Amino acid sequence: MEERIIESETRQCKAIFPGTLNANETLFGGQAMQWMDEVAYITATRFTRKKMFTVSTDNIKFLKTVSPGMFAEIVGKVEKVGSVKLHVKIEIWAEEMYGTERYKAIEGTFIFASLDENLKPQRL
């Protein structure tokens, strides 16, 4: 199982442009959560190779702001495997485009389940 966890780790990089900002001119939290859910979904699907559905999120923390002119790397890794639910840890790392500063800006857990054709949970 450890090998599957390693192989399913997913990384996606985004540039922070004006269209992703909020009224305070930092990364909009809703945009960040959309990116997190997408990477979590890809991670869960790569791990299980089944149709996965987001069940819930847990403990999303906005640790530091992300400014325009930065990169955001979204990293997903399987954290816990249950009989029907899968927990994916997501971190967003902010990185200067033209410098060396890099820091963890946002983190959270996304919980997924695989559902059958009747939308009932099925074993992973």
Model-predicted segments: where are they?
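Small beta-barrel nucleic-acid-binding modules, principally OB-folds
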Residues: 49-65
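Generic hydrophobic-segment detector
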Residues: 15, 19-20, 59, 66, ...
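Hot-dog-fold acyl-thioester-processing enzymes
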Residues: 1-53, 113-124
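Generic preference for hydrophobic/aromatic residues in regular secondary structure cores
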Residues: 52-54, 70, 105
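HotDog/MaoC-like acyl-thioester-processing domains
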Residues: 3-12, 67-68, 79-124
